[in-house]
Amino acid sequence: TTPQTIFPVAWTWPTGKKITCPKTNLFLKPYKTYDNHKRIAAAQSHFRLWQMCASMNEPIMILEHDALFTKKFTAQETSAILVGAYSINDPRGATFKSKDYHNNLVDGFNKVPWVAPENIPQGLPGHSAYVITPWAAKDIIEKQDRIGWWPNDAIMCRQLCEWLYVYKPYFTK
């Protein structure tokens, strides 16, 4: 998806001032972006991949253009815990409070750590490299339809997606 090929959506993320979402009670802060169409295009790219994951009924890996592998990826066993999606990306330099994010993780699967007040959406570091299951893809599509469209890294947050994890050691940066 590019800014030229975006389709109309119910974009509810603020572009001017900070708000509290009436549907989630989460504090939403506008992103610093020159062209909001690029933010919408990125959200639509992830959305299309979530749709593909759900229709294929197979887990998929989603990689953004800037994801760089630092070692060979091996799919992690998720049957022992209820993992809907997990990041494989090193948070350092990829998200806000990235050092705190990294320092709160141990080897293996980790819930997305709290690095800010709990009313601020907190999700995968950079949202640029993750594995998602079909049931989680269906869940996030439903949430987006109900809440409205947000940037993909905000809608897929710990507060809305209890099935969100981070895997360490990381495979990408």
Language model regions located:
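An acidic/histidine-cluster motif and surrounding catalytic segment
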Residues: 1-63, 67-173
